[in-house]
Design a protein with these regions (language model features):
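Structured C-terminal helix/loop/strand segments within mature extracytoplasmic catalytic/sensor domains
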Residues: 1-8, 28, 114-116, 159-188, ...
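Beta-lactamase-like hydrolase cores
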Residues: 1-35
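Mid-domain, small-residue-enriched loop/turn segments at the edges of structured enzyme/sensor domains
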Residues: 15, 88, 109-161, 165-166
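Soluble periplasmic/extracytoplasmic beta-strand elements of cell-envelope proteins
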Residues: 17-21, 30, 46, 67, ...
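Active-site-proximal beta-strand/loop segments in catalytic clefts of secreted hydrolases
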Residues: 21-23, 70-71, 100-103, 114-115, ...
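Acidic helix-start/capping segments at beta-turn-to-alpha-helix junctions
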Residues: 23, 62-78, 115-116, 181
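Active-site SXXK
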Residues: 26, 38-66, 226
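Conserved catalytic neighborhood of penicillin-recognizing serine enzymes
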Residues: 73-109, 117
Length: 261
């Protein structure tokens, strides 16, 4: 299995990192697991966790409502930027759902402003995920031009997903709330390699030259994690090439774990 995954990574004209980890046994396979990658929308998972942690700590209420103001709106993915100014009032929990399911950048920035960028990074460090850092809001082109990117590693992402599966991010209730939102997504490279009857809690991300995906595949009796992060050379490759490599990893993982007990 390790050799097959390494061959997939070696076939990418760029940099490719992955973790495939067994949650019911000891199997774990890695390639570039400790390498930092820009996360694109996958950084929204740590943001979600910080929101839920602060709700548990009494710093905010998930039922609290926020108007979507003109100054909140930002471009890129999502729907809130297309709506009228101050015509929509949403709960913090609803903003979380929009951030994950629609990857809504306006909802994401509203949540970052609510919880504090530095708190996301601090919480990740407290979990042993020191390489996972939130350094800018969504669509902040000036910060991006300065090289301030939101980062993580395959190993950190796998650790975060394991904590959610085990119910040890804050507690079982908070972990389950996060998973319930992450399960709402329908389309992703790893998701596509698993039968629809199998639940997958996941978040994909995409930027020019970059694809990422964090996935917890809840295969009955044999749950497992697949994290893939990759960049490619746009002069010789495309999104489709990297997406195909990610799907190969997902197929290998499903084939490996299916039927194991």
């Amino acid at each position: 299995m390790q050799a097959r995954l390494q061959a997939i990574a070696d076939g990418v004209d760029g940099t490719f990192g992955l973790v495939v980890a067994d949650l019911a046994g000891q199997h774990r396979f890695e390639v570039n697991a400790d390498r930092q990658f820009t996360q694109a929308s996958c950084i929204k998972t740590p943001i979600l966790l910080e929101v839920l942690k602060q709700a548990h700590d009494g710093k905010l209420q998930l039922a609290d409502r926020r108007w979507v103001e003109k100054q909140d709106k930002t471009g890129g993915s999502g729907i809130l930027a297309e709506l009228g100014d101050r015509t929509v009032e949403l709960s913090i929990d609803d903003l979380c759902v929009l951030m994950i399911v629609m990857s809504d950048n306006t909802a994401t920035n509203m949540l970052i402003d609510q919880i504090g960028m530095e708190n996301v990074t601090a919480t990740m460090a407290s979990l042993g995920c020191e390489q996972t850092v939130l350094r800018r809001r969504m669509m902040d082109t000036a910060a991006a031009a300065r090289g301030e990117e939101n980062l993580s590693t395959p190993a950190d992402a796998a650790r975060i997903l394991r904590l959610l599966h085990e119910g040890t991010f804050v507690n079982r209730e908070v972990s389950n709330h996060a998973l319930s939102i992450l399960r709402k997504l329908k389309s992703g490279a790893i998701r596509s390699t698993v039968p629809q009857s199998v639940s997958v809690a996941f978040k994909p991300g995409e930027l020019p030259g970059l694809l990422t995906e964090w996935a917890l595949v809840e295969l009955p009796e044999r749950p497992y994690i697949v994290v893939v992060m990759g960049t490619y050379n746009p002069r010789s490759s495309t999104d489709d090439d990297l997406d195909a490599a990610m799907k190969q990893v997902g197929k290998e993982a499903y084939k490996f774990f299916k039927g194991r007990k």
